Curated annotation (Swiss-Prot):
GO terms, molecular function: rRNA binding; structural constituent of ribosome
Family per record: Belongs to the universal ribosomal protein uL3 family.
Alphabetical keyword list: Ribonucleoprotein, Ribosomal protein, RNA-binding, rRNA-binding
Organism encoding this protein: Prochlorococcus marinus (strain MIT 9515)
GO cellular component term of the entry, any: cytosolic large ribosomal subunit
Entries under InterPro entries matching the protein: Ribosomal_uL3, Ribosomal_uL3_bac/org-type, Ribosomal_uL3_CS, Transl_B-barrel_sf
GO terms under biological process: translation
Protein name in UniProt: Large ribosomal subunit protein uL3
Protein role: One of the primary rRNA binding proteins, it binds directly near the 3'-end of the 23S rRNA, where it nucleates assembly of the 50S subunit.
Residue stretches of biased makeup (Low complexity): 142-153
Residue span of region Disordered: 129-161
Assembly behavior: Part of the 50S ribosomal subunit. Forms a cluster with proteins L14 and L19.
């Protein structure tokens, strides 16, 4: 069973297929990550592999965190992530997880934090139509009606209104791996990935029935 990997979104570009069609792709610096802990059913109640990514400064970590990370290597890591597995006997603490864990043609799920846009209005946040801009209209970007009158006498929870837009965890599923460069730790996937360039993303094999998920160990 294949586990996932942490990486950094570099940005978008395009490749050309055999027919000359432009394919939009996202470039991700995937790993290398280090196995920092192996969790077992007997000790932790479940079986999982914890990996770390990105170098952290000493001053940003507490003593318990530094003690935990130094058990797996000399470098202090900034981001940790767990992946539940059926068994982890093929892994050991300190083992390096690289982009070679994936293969071209495989489908992956990628999670990241969407770009925060702050407090946004109805049109930007939900795509509502605006009102007339001329002929005396005073309703340009106003919300319009938000509900009925005396009954129910309130606005129902979940009503789409202005508010904070973005800055949430988003997962895009079924992205196709089109290229791998293990020399540069580069993973190239077809389509867009949540987050802005430089943000941390979590890449794991797609396990949707009928898709070519991860089978490498």
């Amino acid at each position: 069973m294949s586990i996932g990997i942490l990486g950094k979104k570099l940005g978008m570009s395009q490749l050309f297929d055999d027919d000359g069609n432009a394919v939009p792709v996202t470039l991700i610096e995937a790993g290398p990550c280090r196995v920092t802990q192996l969790k077992t059913q007997s000790l932790d109640g479940y079986t999982a592999i914890q990996i770390g990514y990105g170098v952290s400064k000493d001053k940003h970590l507490s003593k318990p965190e530094k003690g935990h990370l130094l058990k797996s290597g000399k470098e202090l890591l900034k981001h940790l992530k767990e992946f539940k597995v059926e068994e982890n006997s093929s892994y050991e603490i300190g083992k390096e997880i690289t982009v070679t864990n994936f293969e071209v043609g495989q489908k992956v799920d990628i999670s990241g934090k969407s770009m925060g846009r702050g407090f946004s209005g109805y049109q930007k946040r939900h795509g509502f139509s605006r009102g007339p801009m001329s002929h005396g209209s005073k309703n340009h970007r106003a919300p319009g009606s938000t509900g009925a009158g005396t009954t129910p006498g309130r606005i129902y929870p979940g009503k789409r209104m202005a508010g904070r837009y973005g800055g949430k965890k988003i997962t895009t599923k079924g992205l196709l791996v089109v290229k791998i460069d293990d020399q540069k730790n580069l993973l190239v996937v077809k389509g867009s990935v949540p987050g802005k360039p430089g943000s941390i993303v979590n890449i794991r094999p797609n396990n949707t029935v009928g898709n070519k998920g991860g089978t490498k160990s």
